[in-house]
Amino acid sequence: MNSMRISGHQSAVDARDHIEFAGGGRGPGNPGGGRGPGSPGGGRGPGSPGGGRGPGSPGGGRGPGSPGGGRGPGSPGGGRGPGSPGGGRGPGGGRGPSGGRGGDGRRREESPTDHEDGRINRSGRSTSTTTTRTSSTLARPTTVRAPVRPKGPIALPVTMTVREFSEATGVGAAEILKALLKAGVVANINQQIDYETAAVIAADFGIETVEYVPPQLEGIVENIRDVLAAQDPKDLKPRPPVVTIMGHVDHGKTKLLDAIRSTRVAESEAGGITQHIGAYQVELHGRKITFLDTPGHEAFTAMRARGAQVTDIVVLVVAADDGVMPQTLEAISHVKAAGVPMIVAINKIDAPNANPDRVRQQLANAGVIVEQFGGDVPSVEVSAKLKKNIDGLLEMILLVADLNEYKANPNAPAVGTIVEAEMDRTRGPVATVLVQNGTLRLEDNVLVGATTGTIRTMFNDAGKRLRFAEPATPVVILGLNDVPQAGDILQVMPDLTVAREIALQRQRKQRLEAMASTRGVSLDGLFSSIQQGKIKELNIILKADVQGSIGAIEHALSQLNTDEVQIRIIHRGTGTITESDVNLAIASHAIIIGFNARPDPAARRQAEQYGVDIRFYNIIYQLTEDIKKAMIGMLEPEYREVTEGFAEVRTTFRLPTREIVAGLYVTEGKITRQYNVRVLRNGVVIHDGKIASLKRFKDDVREVQAGYECGLIVEGFNDITPGDTMEFYRRERVERTV
């Protein structure tokens, strides 16, 4: 007997062998029903839901009747006679509810009244019947052919749903969900999974995958030099030169830039080292010059190398009294590798033991022949302290710029390089970008490294708001979704959706690169652990005040890798050291380095409880020297900081002597007159010094405990505002063991 599905227009007679009705036999009657005109039963009589060729509605055959319907137009059920509900040919019985072919007997489940919402009960009441259900033979599911698995590698996007993954690979969704569950991933068919997870699952099924690269990536800038080389010469116009100042630590780089800009930036730098990257423009004779100032000394900073790549001219600062130093030589290497012209600025000519000729001879020995010695490298003698011959240096820069004819296309979509980035507590991600080609405008959609955004605000180094920035202009921008890396390329994108897709791909790659092993050690026991073969890698969590410092420190630490141990930064970020950072250090056995960054109280307590090693620095050279000595077993006794108390600045007022008195509330520990004080703003160190005065009311005191208020003057420092935090500490001598 062939299986078939009965439509609403098919005859009940034709389907009799396949369908059993809820009614009875041939008699009329209620649930039973013979041939009489019963209710839900159903022969050929005029019933509604029954269903032959009568005029039924949804169920019917060829007639126009209600749902079901026999050949006559009657009510539900019905045989041939006109009887009322009940059996036989008269009112009543018949063969009863379970009789004949239709009753509640053994094949009740095959009744057409058992499907969906259309049901007929034994009392003769009917409900709307929309679909006729067939026998088990008819209900057999249709055979579905399994999806064909592709041959060869398949391309998968950065993220996809389980359903999309199933369709792409030909693996059933249920199998994929089971495999994900075994891998520890609880998902549903609409859940998003990333490429790494999909590739692992695909490999379990013997399927090779490759990452899909969108066609839009073809227009993505990876090298700015390629962008400039691709410009039509007819579209190029002159632009200001971009100058980077390089040189040995304390040779006066920031002092020189300070003299050029006539500001006091140099006074705030720790140990003579520029800790923040800056980008500034100055003007001479109506022409602009852009200066980049990068952190630390060239020996250990990647930003110096990046600066040489984005710069047109390098001013190499050499002190007339110190001469050429190791970091001077490494700066020369950066310049030569970048292939940019160099100008030597011999600084500190006002020093008593200054000897410019000796400096020129040392430079010649290093392969830098100045013009006075018959070479092609200009040299200018200056005094940043006395601001002597500064204009002469600027004129030399403009002369070199004229010889090299620096140009860009101001009408192209903007492309530039990030020189500094940080997370501002009130403004969000803030980045300084040097526009190198095109014009950057407000409301431009941009792709910056692994993040995206829309330019909402833009201003120059003087704080003036701008609507656009032309080539060689440094600007601070707001509107990014995350903090980019120093050295990332900014590119204007026509479609923000495409930019986000590309940023997502880059984030995935960064996660892969950041993966590290979970073994680490404290700095004190580093050499001993290396000798015993306990570790092969030193895990570091790095927190700094700005993004540019992170890049500089990362490059510095990368120079310290040896065959015995590799340094691996498992996490980096800007701002306060948090409890999350400490928890990561606990799990990965890492040490935490705070560069001008301090822990919050919760993080400090967590670190003390679990013995997490947190080191604080404000000079990159000291940081690298400590780790280098630890790795070779040459650590000497140190003075370790012991934090004794914290206080919150509630108010400030100025004395007639111009000193600022900070009104404090001691929140933790105690303050003692002999302690050192560190002023923190938003978790970042802005001053480290000594206590000049400590008072309660008008009386000098030696100590103030937690829960009390006091007045305090910081020696030689007045930039204190309400909301700042003060940390009080002492130093104790500690013998290091290896």
From Swiss-Prot:
Q: According to the UniProt entry, which residue ranges have a biased composition of type Gly residues?
A: 22-102
Composition bias type Polar residues, residue spans: 1-10
Among CDD domains, the record links this protein to: IF2_eIF5B (cd01887), IF2_mtIF2_II (cd03702), mtIF2_IVc (cd03692)
Q: What GO MF annotations does this protein's record show?
A: GTP binding; GTPase activity; translation initiation factor activity
UniProt KW Nucleotide-binding keyword = yes
Extract the ranges annotated as region (Disordered): 1-150
Residue intervals passing through the bilayer: none
Cell compartment(s), UniProt: Cytoplasm
**Region annotation (G2) ranges:** 272-276
GTP-binding listed as a keyword: yes
PROSITE patterns, alphabetized: G_TR_2, IF2
Q: Name one Pfam family in it.
A: IF-2
Per the entry, what this protein does is: One of the essential components for the initiation of protein synthesis. Protects formylmethionyl-tRNA from spontaneous hydrolysis and promotes its binding to the 30S ribosomal subunits. Also involved in the hydrolysis of GTP during the formation of the 70S ribosomal complex.
Record-stated family: Belongs to the TRAFAC class translation factor GTPase superfamily. Classic translation factor GTPase family. IF-2 subfamily.
- Which HAMAP family does the entry mention? IF_2_B
- Quote the protein name from its UniProt record: Translation initiation factor IF-2
Q: Which organism is it from?
A: Roseiflexus castenholzii (strain DSM 13941 / HLO8)
Question: What does the record give as the organism's lineage?
Answer: Bacteria, Bacillati, Chloroflexota, Chloroflexia, Chloroflexales
- Its gene name is infB
